[in-house]
Amino acid sequence: MTNPSPKLTPMFEQYLRIKEDYPDALLFYRMGDFYELFFDDAETTARELQIALTCRNPNAELKAPMCGVPYHAVEGYISQLLDKGYRVAICEQIEDPKEAKGLVKRAVTRVLTPGTVIDDANLDAKEHNYLGALFWNQDAEAGAFAWVDVSTGEWSGLYSRKLAELWQWAQKMAPRELLLPEGVDTPAMATLGTTQTVRVPARSHFDLKSGTERVMRAQGVADLGSLGLEGKPELVRACAALLAYLAQTQKQELSHLAPFKPLNLGRHLIIDEVTERNLELFHRLDGRKGPGTLWHILDRTLTPMGGRLLEERMHHPWREAGPIRETQQVVEWLFQDDVRREALRTALDLVYDLERLSTRIFLNRATPKDFIALRQSLSALPAVRATLERPANPEGTYPTDAETSGDTLPKPLSDMLSAWDDLADYADLLRRALTDNPPHLVTEGGLFRPGFDPDLDELLDLAEHGEARLQELLAEEQTVSGLPKLKLGYNRVFGYFFELSRAGADSVPEHFVRRQTLANAERFTTERLKELEEKLVSATDRRKTLEYRLFQSLRDTVAEARPRVLFMADMLAHLDFWQSLADVARRNGWVRPDVHTGHDIVIREGRHPVVEAMQGSASFVPNDLRMDEKRRLLLITGPNMAGKSTVLRQTAIICLLAQMGAFVPAREASIGIADRIFSRVGASDNLAQGQSTFMVEMMETARILRQASKRSLVILDEIGRGTSTFDGMALAWAVVEELTRRAGGGIRTLFATHYHEITSLEGRIPGVHNMNIAIREWNGDIVFLRRLVPGPADKSYGIEVARLAGVPHSVVQRARELLADLERTRDAARGTNSAPSRQTLPGLDLPSKQEQVDTIVAPPPCSGVEHPLLVALRDIDTDDMTPLEALKRITEWKQLWGTTREDRS
């Protein structure tokens, strides 16, 4: 029989009992001034944070690995762990150790996860931090994706009958955590990047009945109609999962969330994650942020709220002319007046993150420093307002042909001023209450100014003037009692006392109480001395306790102002967003585009804003571009490195900027509003999921062909290059034909290709128009002119580009020989007008190594009339077809073909 293990200490028993409830989190266990971690948690944390790993003995036989971090610096350590994808459970002492009988009671007060943090140390100031939830109802063939930023209280979502569309939005919004019902797998097509998937029980988190109650309770409504959730049970379930997870991690029901706003796709230009990546809106193609992205060019915001609004507008530009033109009016008004704009920037620079400050205050997670930041922000509001009310300065204006002059306030700004709230009452309260440099922790005291609270003033006076009070009492007793030789003393045993010589002790008044007799002296106390002593000894503790109570009261009062603070935060965010667009336009010489509801796109001297910023405006070559009913698909040819991809990207970016309401990098621009922008540019693969570069290219092309409409803008770069020459050319040719047939006249498309044979489609298919990037041959070299000119390119100059890239001379020379032979073969075949010939390449004469090349011939023209079955097959979306729907469609197709069972019998 084995001996039982020695009993664990009470502390370790408590630790293990709490840890059992949080097996997937690192448990930060509060012990005095430190958070300690034990066992596997300690080893993991020590490794990830590069801190010392020690050990502690839970009993006589066991040694437990241990590490710890000081409580006053814990935020920085937790931030590192969250960035690495860990969850952290914070276990606090929930009773005062001085009053505890035995082991101090402890409990987990919150669980920190990447998608639920609200502290600045764990957040990027100008980026949203989303928690997402995706739910698909297989029976109803419908689903939803919802997301929330806990730090600001904003949340939204969308309902769809296409599962693929929901996953596209999950990729686009890139939540830090994505909640999925247990048993649901991530599809192979989804590339979630840094998003962590979290499986949660469907019954508890995604349940419709309890979820409906949870959503209505959190939003304070009696029905779902006011939230836009009526008749969308799948979206209700996704929202409910978010709320359940937040309650589970935050250990409280969150009531700070703003009213839920479903995303109205009909109001916004849709840009999927692939297009955002290809256009390098937020990240470069190598995944890094900063220089090389459109965000880096546009971000001249000064407040975190303005930065996040800029991010939102880049994700979701407008599709309606009204909001676009309103934004343009304000941007132009600020663009005109440099003095006003700089004054506005100076005032906005004093404003902190009002949204996140308000959230932390409301959730009782704010530090004294947060209140100081709020005070400074509110104090800046009058200065911001004054910049809008001041008359225009003629010396600082920039003349334009604007519809708004410097003295005419655009309607969005006049509406803003009419509703402006300086929050002067709360700014005054915070000025009167708090010192300029309060401590970081509420429990340390020293928070409040003198004069804010009479009781606190008395305690502060005692702490500061206690010795003087004692001397005043001594002088009073000396005078009133007639004891001029009376002295005041102190020791740790008796505290404060009066002392007289043995000879003078006989004449003390009756209110003197003897405390101690010495050889040559007597020591006394009085009621007043005891009262003063008690006040002095307890003044520090009483002051800290009172200040903590006053701070909580102040927090509750300021929390009531959250709706007003958020209202002004939204105003400041828009002002910051508008001035940022104006400042960027002024600095870079951008112009206000004409945005209309037609389909034409006309750009004069357009530029790529990112490339121009990196190269310098002097060396960047601008280009003109026109798309209309006769030029709906532009075939762009030219050599590598000539600038085809730049032209494609800059056109898409100019359209995106225009629909944000921003100015654009061009001399002049007229943009027909698009409903979606699609981009298939550059090579990429997904090897982890078994998808080659060509497979990814075809999947993205398929999505474009399924989803693009007549109002869409499509940019395609070198479709078909990842396979054999003829396969690739055939695919590219077929894609061009399909794009010109779609949507009753074709889809607006920029199509860059090296398959020069496709340029023969101009004149054969309406709407196809050839353009090329011009080059010049000079003394055996090629000079890239970077100019987009009419007509097709005569050749690709790939060998010359290879030579410029440093490919060895022998390889370049051999390539020239092979090219010359291939061209002779092609020309001979065309000259004899015979059947396609085959020619063995020179130098490859071994039978087993022969490569044969067919002469390129134009494919047959497509028939003017398609069979109805072909039309039905082409338009079907197999990704979202159910088995029942498939059977129904097959029956329809058989009828179209004329081979029903009845016909065969």
From Swiss-Prot:
Q: Which PROSITE patterns match?
A: DNA_MISMATCH_REPAIR_2
Disulfide cross-links = none
The role this protein plays is: This protein is involved in the repair of mismatches in DNA. It is possible that it carries out the mismatch recognition step. This protein has a weak ATPase activity.
**Compositionally skewed regions (Polar residues) per UniProt:** 831-840
Report which superkingdom the organism of origin falls in: Bacteria
- Give the UniProt keywords, A-Z: ATP-binding, DNA damage, DNA repair, DNA-binding, Nucleotide-binding
Q: Which NCBIfam families does this UniProt record tie to the protein?
A: mutS1, PRK05399.1
Q: Could you tell me which PANTHER family the record lists for this protein? A: DNA MISMATCH REPAIR PROTEIN MSH1, MITOCHONDRIAL, DNA MISMATCH REPAIR PROTEIN MUTS FAMILY MEMBER
Question: Would the keyword Lipid metabolism turn up in this protein's UniProt record?
Answer: no
Q: Where does ATP bind?
A: 638-645
The UniProt similarity line reads: Belongs to the DNA mismatch repair MutS family.
The entry's protein name is: DNA mismatch repair protein MutS
Instruction: Please list the GO biological process terms of this entry.
Output: mismatch repair
Region annotated Disordered, chain positions: 388-410, 826-847
Pfam families, per database record = MutS_I, MutS_II, MutS_III, MutS_IV, MutS_V
Report the GO molecular function annotations: ATP binding; ATP-dependent DNA damage sensor activity; damaged DNA binding; mismatched DNA binding
**What cellular component terms from Gene Ontology apply here?**
cytosol
